[in-house]
């Protein structure tokens, strides 16, 4: 009930202003009696992924809490894990405003945020300050002004700084809003990046006597051959997981809607089928050797079950969470428990 009222107010506001208000409000109310307004108890439905045991298979996707400011509030809602970021080595403002658009009739969102964040050092402070023991993944990227050829250096810097504070690390090379970033998904650039990250992971594991899994987040706008090549690179470099998928540059199902022609990545319900298609193909190529976290267009428990059926071991929500609220978490967990 509270979420429906809050949503009605938020949806009258500019989307990015509403986002900042929501994160700020959650930050203020976390670990206080006011969590009763949005908190809920969800019976455990444990799932093992990447060598980790999560209390349930529903996580918050990266992009909602970029700087890790409201982690404890999302824990109160019942998420099995929270993925913060995308974070970059240095703070950056992101792309020009406006850069976030709702497509309400289609339950979609278009964003061209551009990795706006306060930098990895600020994120680490927030990870240290959190009071709950929720599993937190850290999604890392490169700064906009770092040449693609030197992009791996930014990922290694972020890895070094977040390693001790992350349950797992997600490598984001699939955002469409950082020029040239998606080129890291192909050929020699992909293999060089994954190899460098794996080497760094093993060095940090030896140094800290702690193994932190690494997952790669991929785009939905890939051919079968490109998915096969990514899968082979993941297996070759012994990555721990894959996250499929990021937002799409296609506009299937939204043509004619207000804001549909805005540039950026489309998420939400219009992404549902494309994401499932990629997960199915990726699962075939990975042959069970590497687990998949399914994300993209989950607006109901049935959408989540379709991700599991396609080959995902765990799921994440973002746009569906904005449109449906915290009840979606419980609905998915209950459906997962019964499947």
From Swiss-Prot:
BP-aspect Gene Ontology terms: 'de novo' pyrimidine nucleobase biosynthetic process; 'de novo' UMP biosynthetic process
Membrane topology: Peripheral membrane protein
Metabolic or biological pathway: Pyrimidine metabolism; UMP biosynthesis via de novo pathway; orotate from (S)-dihydroorotate (quinone route): step 1/1
Keyword set, alphabetical order: Cell membrane, Flavoprotein, FMN, Membrane, Oxidoreductase, Pyrimidine biosynthesis
Main location: membrane
Role summary: Catalyzes the conversion of dihydroorotate to orotate with quinone as electron acceptor.
Domain of life: Bacteria
InterPro entries: Aldolase_TIM, DHO_dehydrogenase, Dihydroorotate_DH_1_2, Dihydroorotate_DH_2, Dihydroorotate_DH_cat, Dihydroorotate_DH_CS
The protein's name in its UniProt record: Dihydroorotate dehydrogenase (quinone)
Organism: Shewanella baltica (strain OS155 / ATCC BAA-1091)
Chain sites annotated for binding substrate: 66, 111-115, 172, 177, 246-247
Entry EC no(s): 1.3.5.2
PANTHER family: DIHYDROOROTATE DEHYDROGENASE (QUINONE), MITOCHONDRIAL (PTHR48109:SF4), DIHYDROOROTATE DEHYDROGENASE (QUINONE), MITOCHONDRIAL-RELATED (PTHR48109)
Top-level EC class as recorded in UniProt: oxidoreductase
Classification via CDD domains: DHOD_2_like
Residues given in the record as FMN binding sites: 62-66, 86, 139, 172, 217, 245, 268, 297, 318-319
Assigned GO CC terms: cytoplasm; plasma membrane
